[in-house]
């Protein structure tokens, strides 16, 4: 009953040979096919930009992206892929955003920003303040990763009240496995944020079909069951649609 074919995925690694996502065209296409089968119809490509780790030249990412756009047309005529970036915050990011060197999400006011798991709250707060001062609206990637935000409604609300939006990964929505679930703590955090109404978007952060596939349909179903169909639509369709169309949430 929860099958939705209008999902919009604003966090994905679908471009081959540019980061830790797909290695080649075939892997890119396999991801696109799986996402489409799950009901995703628009994917924002957010390859990593991270100083010292993922430093693929912008023109190479753009060139490979245009090939992925072509692959999407082969997968299905109604599968839409648009351009973006997952931006790991470092001191040089502000200048690069200001000069439009690194892309925002589909050319909108929204930018997907990530931090390391151990980044202190004051650094997250100050980084997001700097981004906001450029007139850019941060979407904070996978908030369930950051230790400083664990069980801390007050901090997350503060970031939201500043004007930021919060994203969690679909993999973190899944039920924890009984044994050997390395990511159990992230699933607990994600559930806390959902319970408190602190999540604006669920997205896949898919990298490959082996260990980081999209779990969009599964996550959609779980959220629809637990929080209602309207909430599921809001997190997987309505809000992501507003983001890629440069509208306010």
Tell me what each language-model feature is.
Residues 36, 132, 194-195:
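Non-catalytic positions within long, well-ordered alpha-helices that form the structural scaffold/packing
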Residues 8-10, 44-46, 82-85, 139-141, ...:
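Active-site neighborhood of phospho(di)ester-bond hydrolases with catalytic His/Asp-centered motifs
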Residues 196-213:
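Short acidic/histidine-rich active-site segments
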Residues 55-167:
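Extended substrate/RNA-proximal surfaces in nucleic-acid metabolism proteins
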Residues 13-15, 19, 48-49, 84-90, ...:
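Active-site beta-loop-alpha junctions enriched in small/polar residues
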Residues 24-27, 60-62, 96-97, 151-157, ...:
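Charged helix-capping and loop-helix junction motifs
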Residues 216-249:
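Mid-to-C-terminal alpha-helical segments outside catalytic/metal-binding sites
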Residues 1-79:
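An N-terminally biased module of ancient metal coordination in phosphate/nucleic-acid-related enzymes
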